[in-house]
């Protein structure tokens, strides 16, 4: 039996592509463009795992498909190479993070090239290259000049173990850090902020213009969190102080029985009475140790302290005790709420716990038992009584505005983006703080502000980054003799990844971020493939920067990514015990088709789980490429199931994909190829061209491969294979298995040219229709024969053919035919006696 040798074929074609710059981006202005973008990886020390190539293979298939369809294709790759892991490694080992990163990139690039992806490596970018981050810094200076980058004393999410503050988006639901899982505490610090809130409405509205999964759009909508309601001003009794509350339900103001301020609210100390001062100070201290997520957890026990003061409800003059509680955040809304315990679960629980008044203002429910959170007509509400929700809100807003104690208001949950990190391994923020109290941006002519090389990269612990220790870099003097210090904070990893897709378009430009004409030619990105875990962070930040650049006239489109696709996760083989705990694969043995714990003998259930070192179920693509070949890995990952589904890795599935490719190789290299078309494969070939073309376009790669298998099965039944169909089939499979595609193309054509730019095959619609049809012949209602006849024969012709059939003649010999019923294209029924 013939098998192909992937160890010879794959390196041969990889060298051919590299030597001939086969995948250099096309520049023919008469052709349509296609920009296929992968989320570029962070080059970790662990290298690629088999999850990475799933998305990369999808964009590669599309890129090869579009090249063959006559498009200029931009399909680049680069490295998101700043970030904490390299710095952590450097601190642990004493090595330079730049050297460590360069080694990791070389390893990633080797692995990626071994998988046969058609990247244009002339466009490679690296976020740690000063020629790249010059423009990251330039974007920052533009944000600064526009007032969109500013310094503020803000409570930050401080992670002691990392020695840095992190953004809200980087705090996990359990209140630990996304990176490392460390405890997060709130701590006030001077920080750089980016005013993403100025773009909240546009970030929301323009989601309508992009072809993204609805689930991702919803995550962004929820994160932006637009609310329409009213601001209401409450005066503090016996003082000249007041505070503002934002509420989406101003119609329930008659039911507000107490107010709650965030412990950090500026008014707290001023209105706290002497009797309550100690309790309030204690409570504030405890609250500062909790993350926002821990504080707002709905399930946690309600805690709070009364300030000793009262607010006056503006609508009825009632006195409302003012409390502080950690479930109210200073960073959200106004940092103060009016509590309507009859109609809000959290307020109800708080009121019950601290014995506060509960006054129902909506009809329905029993507020002694539980908060009534549905809609109802208004009661106990004076001029709102009997009104429904919408009418009551409108009337109350009108009253508030007329009385000068409130106004209609739109708010957003979105907070400004905490942009500074107290770390070494990041882009220096190009700002100088002068001793006269002013700050200026480093001028463009002096960019890039290069990150200095230093051995001392441990966090200072003072809230400054290790750059504070590099004196000769840190201290500067102006021409007029005024001394200054450079900003010591660095940018977060999100900075370089917020605009990298623009640099691929013009990666070697030293004068500007990218040429305007090239940006017009290539934007927006046509397809962006990556994990759904980036729904809020990266995708929101990139959209924000893109909109700023649009306002600056740098980019011609409002949105960066026209279509987004999230590939699923490839899960590892793993096992669970009876308690549901996962068991590492090296603790499992297989006996008689079942799985058992080596140490306890307990029978285990096979259960796919995320690949992890601890479960010892991480699959290294290097091993797969060595044993089965890159084409097998590519075909297997595309054939596993729908691209957006999470599916378990299977060695059997991998072997099945390899067997299929061996069958393809045998079909083309051992079957007699002929210039004469017998017509036997007309229908299946044309169906295959049509199906694969449509399914690749729709990213339904698994069904495209299934159709290729149908063709192979049909072709194997024939003695000879028509040359045009052999070539067309090889073109169809080449985007999935490019090395094999090139090898078989040469076997058929000996052209010496790559298959990459050979025009994509077309199909003949007329061949999709069967000219013959199978009919059944029934005698006495039982099927006696099946006949293949020309389509659309008349009743008379059908009757003739049926009666002339040998089997039928044997059945009716010596019998009287009473009648013959012929139904064209279906059946002939013969009645005899």
Curated annotation (Swiss-Prot):
Residues engaged in binding ATP: 613
Coiled coil, from the record: none
EC numbers on record: 6.1.1.4
EC class name: ligase
Molecular function in Gene Ontology: aminoacyl-tRNA deacylase activity; ATP binding; leucine-tRNA ligase activity
One BP annotation, GO: leucyl-tRNA aminoacylation
Similarity section: Belongs to the class-I aminoacyl-tRNA synthetase family.
Protein name: Leucine--tRNA ligase
Record bears the keyword Metal-binding: no
Motif 'HIGH' region, residue range(s) on this chain: 41-52
InterPro entries: aa-tRNA-synth_I_CS (IPR001412), aa-tRNA-synth_Ia (IPR002300), Leu-tRNA-ligase (IPR002302), Leu_tRNA-synth_edit (IPR025709), M/V/L/I-tRNA-synth_anticd-bd (IPR013155), Methionyl/Leucyl_tRNA_Synth (IPR015413), Rossmann-like_a/b/a_fold (IPR014729), tRNAsynth_Ia_anticodon-bd (IPR009080)
GO cellular component, one term: cytosol
Organism: Streptococcus pyogenes serotype M49 (strain NZ131)
Compartment(s) of residence: Cytoplasm
PROSITE patterns in the cross-refs: AA_TRNA_LIGASE_I (PS00178)
Motif 'KMSKS' region positions after renumbering to this chain: 610-614
Major location category of this protein: cytoplasm
Entry keyword set: Aminoacyl-tRNA synthetase, ATP-binding, Cytoplasm, Ligase, Nucleotide-binding, Protein biosynthesis
Catalytic reaction annotation: tRNA(Leu) + L-leucine + ATP = L-leucyl-tRNA(Leu) + AMP + diphosphate
């Amino acid at each position: 039996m013939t098998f192909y040798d992937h160890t010879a074929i794959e390196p041969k074609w990889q060298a051919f592509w590299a030597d001939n710059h086969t995948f250099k981006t096309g520049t023919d202005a008469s052709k349509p463009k296609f920009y296929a973008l992968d989320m570029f990886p962070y080059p970790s020390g662990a290298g690629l795992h088999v999850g990475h190539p799933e998305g990369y293979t999808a964009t590669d298939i599309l890129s090869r498909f579009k090249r063959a369809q006559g498009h200029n294709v931009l399909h680049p790759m680069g490295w998101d190479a700043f970030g904490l892991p390299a710095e952590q490694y450097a601190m642990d080992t004493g090595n330079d993070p730049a050297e460590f990163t360069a080694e990791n990139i070389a390893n990633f690039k080797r692995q990626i090239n071994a998988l046969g992806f058609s990247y244009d490596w002339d466009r490679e970018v690296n976020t740690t290259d000063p020629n790249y981050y010059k423009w990251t810094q330039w974007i920052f200076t533009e944000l600064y000049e526009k007032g969109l980058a500013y310094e503020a004393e803000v409570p930050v999410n401080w992670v002691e173990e990392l020695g840095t503050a992190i953004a809200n988006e980087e705090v996990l639901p359990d209140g630990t850090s996304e990176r490392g899982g460390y405890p997060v505490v709130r701590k006030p610090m001077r920080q750089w902020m980016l005013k993403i809130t100025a773009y909240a409405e546009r970030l929301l509205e323009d989601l309508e213009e992009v072809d993204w999964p609805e689930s991702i759009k919803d995550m962004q909508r929820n994160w932006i969190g637009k609310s329409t309601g009213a601001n209401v001003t409450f005066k503090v009794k016996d003082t000249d102080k007041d505070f503002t509350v934002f509420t989406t339900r101003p119609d329930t103001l008659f039911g507000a029985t107490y107010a709650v301020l965030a412990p950090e609210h500026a008014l707290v100390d001023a209105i706290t009475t002497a009797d309550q001062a100690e309790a309030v100070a204690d409570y504030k201290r405890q609250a500062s140790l909790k993350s926002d997520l821990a504080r707002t957890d709905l399930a946690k026990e309600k805690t709070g302290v009364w300030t000793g003061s009262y607010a006056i409800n503006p609508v009825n003059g009632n006195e409302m005790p003012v409390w502080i509680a950690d479930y109210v955040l200073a960073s959200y809304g106004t940092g103060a709420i009016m509590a309507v315990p009859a109609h809000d679960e959290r307020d109800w629980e708080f009121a019950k716990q601290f014995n506060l008044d509960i006054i129902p203002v909506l009809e329905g429910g029993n507020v002694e038992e539980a908060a009534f959170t549905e809609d109802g007509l208004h009661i106990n509400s004076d001029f709102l009584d009997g009104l429904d929700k919408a009418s009551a809100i409108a009337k109350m807003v009108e009253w508030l505005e007329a009385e000068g104690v409130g106004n209609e208001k739109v708010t957003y949950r979105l907070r400004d983006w905490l942009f500074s990190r107290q770390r070494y391994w990041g882009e220096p923020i190009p700002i100088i703080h002068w001793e006269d109290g002013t700050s200026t941006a480093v001028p463009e002519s002096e960019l890039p502000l290069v990150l200095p090389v230093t051995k001392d990269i441990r966090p200072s612990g003072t809230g400054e980054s290790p750059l504070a220790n590099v004196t000769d870099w840190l201290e500067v003097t102006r021409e007029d003799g005024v001394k200054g210090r450079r900003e010591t904070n660095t940018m977060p990893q999100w900075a370089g990844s917020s605009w990298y897709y623009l640099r691929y378009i013009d990666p070697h430009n030293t004068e500007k971020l990218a040429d305007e004409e090239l940006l017009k030619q290539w934007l927006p990105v046509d397809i962006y493939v990556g994990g759904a875990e980036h729904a809020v962070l990266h995708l929101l930040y990139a959209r924000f920067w893109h909109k700023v650049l649009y306002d600056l006239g740098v980019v011609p489109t409002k949105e960066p990514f026209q279509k987004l696709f999230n590939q699923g996760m490839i899960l590892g083989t793993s096992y669970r015990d009876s308690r549901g705990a996962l068991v590492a694969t090296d603790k499992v043995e297989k006996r008689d088709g079942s799985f058992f714990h080596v140490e306890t003998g307990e029978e285990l259930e096979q259960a796919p789980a995320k690949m992890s070192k601890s479960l010892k179920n991480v699959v290294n693509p290097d091993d797969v490429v060595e044993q089965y070949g890159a084409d097998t890995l590519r075909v297997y990952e595309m054939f596993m199931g729908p691209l957006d589904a999470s599916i378990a890795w299977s060695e059997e599935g991998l072997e099945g994909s390899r067997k299929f490719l061996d069958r393809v190789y045998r079909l083309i290299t051992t079957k007699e190829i002929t210039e004469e078309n017998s017509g036997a494969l007309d229908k299946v070939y044309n169906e295959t061209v049509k199906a694969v073309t449509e399914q690749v376009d729709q990213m339904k790669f698994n069904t495209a491969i299934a159709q290729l298998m149908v063709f192979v099965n049909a072709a194997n039944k024939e003695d000879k294979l028509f040359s045009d169909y052999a070539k067309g089939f090889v073109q169809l499979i080449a985007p999935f298995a490019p090395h094999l595609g090139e090898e078989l193309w040469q076997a058929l054509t000996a052209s010496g040219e790559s298959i990459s730019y050979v025009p994509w095959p077309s199909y003949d619609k007329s061949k999709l229709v069967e000219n013959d049809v199978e009919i059944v012949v029934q005698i006495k209602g039982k099927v006696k024969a099946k006949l293949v006849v020309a389509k659309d024969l008349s009743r008379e012709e059908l009757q003739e053919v049926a009666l002339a059939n040998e089997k039928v003649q044997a059945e009716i010999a010596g019998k009287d035919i009473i009648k013959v019923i012929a139904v064209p294209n279906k059946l002939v029924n013969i009645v005899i006696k």
